[in-house]
Curated annotation (Swiss-Prot):
Upper taxonomic lineage: Bacteria, Pseudomonadati, Pseudomonadota, Alphaproteobacteria, Hyphomicrobiales
Top-rank taxon: Bacteria
GO cellular component: membrane
GO-annotated biological processes: lipid A biosynthetic process
Pathway linked to the protein: Bacterial outer membrane biogenesis; LPS lipid A biosynthesis
Protein name: UDP-3-O-acylglucosamine N-acyltransferase 2
Job description of the protein: Catalyzes the N-acylation of UDP-3-O-acylglucosamine using 3-hydroxyacyl-ACP as the acyl donor. Is involved in the biosynthesis of lipid A, a phosphorylated glycolipid that anchors the lipopolysaccharide to the outer membrane of the cell.
Enzyme class: transferase
Amino acid sequence: MSESGFFLDAVGLSVGDIVALTGATPRDGADLSRAISDLAPLDRAGIADLSFIAETKYAGVLAATQAGAVLTTERFAHLAPESVAVLRIAKPYEAFVAVARRLYPSALRPTSLFGTLGVAPGAVVHPSAKLAAGVTVDPGAVIGPRAEIGKGSLIGANAVIGPHVKIGADCAIGAGCTVTHSEIGDRVIVHPGSQIGQDGFGYISSANGHTKVPQIGRVVIHDDVEIGAGSNIDRGGMRDTVIGQGTKIDNLCQIGHNCVIGRHCIIVAQSGLSGSVTVEDFAVLGARTGVIPHITIGKGAMLASRSTVYSNVPAGAVWGGFPAQSKRQWMREVVALRQLAARDHDGRTAASAEAAAPSSDATGVDQPDQAAS
């Protein structure tokens, strides 16, 4: 449910529009002309709201909802009140997201403070910089010599784009970001306060102290990457730091120099990758994952929250713990330790220790929550 004023470009849809957009099947007698202007959870929805149900635990809430329309599987369709336009579909949450994207396009990326195209008063653009058609530069932003900004991109307030940086089309660089020594593809989103292209953490240590190693690589970010607020991506030492197409990096993450992250990876908040780490395609790193230098995380591997990785992770593996290891072995060790800790002075073991083992889904990746939709 949106608070009024934050998303001024919100558009309305009819139930019929939602059917056409999602391919859902309406219940007999559903009013396809009913106007839907907002989204809301089942227990807060009104006649102009769309909601959804995907889990059994919300069946009772569905039976009492006042929503104008509900996306649901066939399993729950009969529970909705007669006043609700029931839209049956195999994957209701995915359909709900499709509608949300249509209703609230400005919620998909950072937007201009003033919502106007062009260079705002107070922004500084070097005469040699190249700005394509439809670029927006908000107040306080600075764009350096020979930088190139692609068609339709946004440079937020107080962002700094360094010399020779290339940013593709339809990108959004949020307020307060710094981008240097980088080449960025199309449709890349960088949320406020992130820093990209600063020098990597490279030193030679001796008895006399620490001598800085010049970092002469770049950061290369491919199309459709999203980087959360307050994250940092260091440029490479003698090769590039690379973020592959479609990868999503959460808030407050650190990507060290020379890292190569593949396509469509997920890196959840507060994770840190040391230098020269390779993360292969479709890998998932749960919140607060830490990885030491020169490690490879295989294609499709998953790391539970707070994993600390000291060795290569095989493709498709599910690991967790400190040090990270296979989920099966990690859980056995946790159970064994808890059994030992629970023994009383007579040596008895608490039978419930195994029930306290970690959840099998401990990545920290958000899952759809009916009550918070």
